[in-house]
Swiss-Prot record:
Its EC number is 3.4.21.92. The gene is clpP. Its main location: plastid. This is ATP-dependent Clp protease proteolytic subunit. It is found in: Plastid, Chloroplast stroma. Keywords: Chloroplast, Hydrolase, Plastid, Protease, Serine protease.
Length: 200
């Protein structure tokens, strides 16, 4: 039996009584954002909208984007990345679980020195794929040209964000490259690996 999204009490500033809001709404108010699904236009627009609102509300407070995503639509992922670069506050990225494909691209887009992977997280990079399988030959050629432009854009961003040379990123993107948290740190996708709490 599905439980749905849990609700928690929250008192709005200036209000006497608390209201019940879903847990994600409560966390957004604390500047904690979540990408816990495949990247598509809907989730990209939601994240961008929240970032823009938080940016206009207070430009001095950082945002924290938790990533556990198998990837998804290239343009939707690039739009989230662009929004992260546009907002004034630093956007910390935290990888938990898996950040693959556009998920790893968004993870790498966090403020440099503020990108973290949890100890058992996995990161995967590869080249963008075309979703165009059926159509006129001319349309396929235009699609292939667009995919090559997107691949070039993504390669340049990864090189800039990781400090790795373009040729190495391009070579690695030819196949699925899976990285442990430590390997992702060595590669430059994240800056730190979180330490496990050993006091338990």
């Amino acid at each position: 039996m599905p439980i749905g999204v849990p609700k928690v009490p929250f008192r709005l500033p200036g209000e006497e009584d608390a209201v019940w809001v879903d847990v994600y709404n409560r966390l957004y108010r604390e500047r904690l954002l979540f990408l816990g699904q495949q990247v598509d236009d809907e989730i990209a627009n939601q994240l961008i909208g929240i970032m823009m609102y938080l940016n206009s509300e207070d430009q001095a407070k950082d945002m924290y984007l938790y990533v556990n995503s198998p990837g998804g639509a290239v343009l939707a992922g690039i739009s989230v990345y662009d929004a992260m670069q546009f907002v004034v506050p630093d956007v910390h990225t935290i990888c938990m679980g898996l950040a693959a494909s556009m998920g790893s691209f968004i993870l790498a887009g966090g403020e440099i020195t503020r990108r973290i992977a949890l100890p058992h997280a996995r990161v995967m990079i590869h080249q963008p794929a075309s979703s165009y399988y059926d159509g006129q030959a001319g349309e396929c050629v235009m699609e292939a040209e667009e995919v090559l432009k997107l691949r070039d854009c993504i390669t340049k961003v990864y090189a800039q964000r990781t400090g790795k040379p373009l040729w190495l990123i391009s070579e690695d993107m030819e196949r699925d490259v899976f990285l442990s948290a430590e390997e992702a740190q060595d590669y430059g996708v994240v800056d730190l690996v979180a330490v496990e709490n050993v006091s338990r």
